[in-house]
Amino acid sequence: MPGRDSVWKEQTIANTSEQQFRVEFECEFLGSVDTLISSAKLKSLVYDEPIQSNRGLDIYFEPIKNHDYVITVDVARGVGIDYSAFVITDITSFPHKVIGKYKNNEIKPMLFPSIIVDIAKAYNNAFILCEVNDIGDQVASIIQYDLEYDNLLLCSMRGRAGQIVGQGFSGKKTQLGVKMSKTVKKVGCSNLKTLIEDEKVIFNDYDIISELTTFIQKHNSFEAEEGCNDDLAMCLVIYLSLIHI
């Protein structure tokens, strides 16, 4: 196309991102590599403008009385590389609906918990599930002990049964969230593929769609293509590791 040469491409990517460029200008890229979600499904996904947008938080639907929500959290160190993120999902009935998301690569782990809890309280005291492999354990600890939020989901280690998610656990084998083991990720990715392609999980967020276009197979797992991010995709994996299908 006239004017759209390599210099234009470099400038466009510099002003947006590699992921955004591929979604908007290289439609043939969708599913052209080993993406978790099929290319046909990726091409059918559309995004809407959020009804609220503020400092990384995008909201698509207001809370509905008596609906059940879960917030799944992936935590970064807040040094501008990876993003701290969470996804808010209405799990009242199928199809589940992603109604909001947060994504920020500068928020410090000490400040992140208050943002999570404020949103959780607004959405009918939503359940919160954190990934606690690294700095996420610190975030979950603040939510549990400092902010004393009642609906933080815990995990109990049960040997061969793996991690059991729920509330009211105690003892040495209890964690303040889920550890992203190979098994948990495998289940979450499998469910993510099945439920999105069967339209049992619905979302209209630009960043989530963008991440899924570069969420590809590497060895026996899935992760972001080099130079891209998968923080929101992993929030979906965390949430869908809870679902039994």
Which ranges hold each PLM region?
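Switch/connector loops and helix/strand junctions flanking conserved nucleotide-binding motifs
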Residues: 3-4, 137-140, 163-166
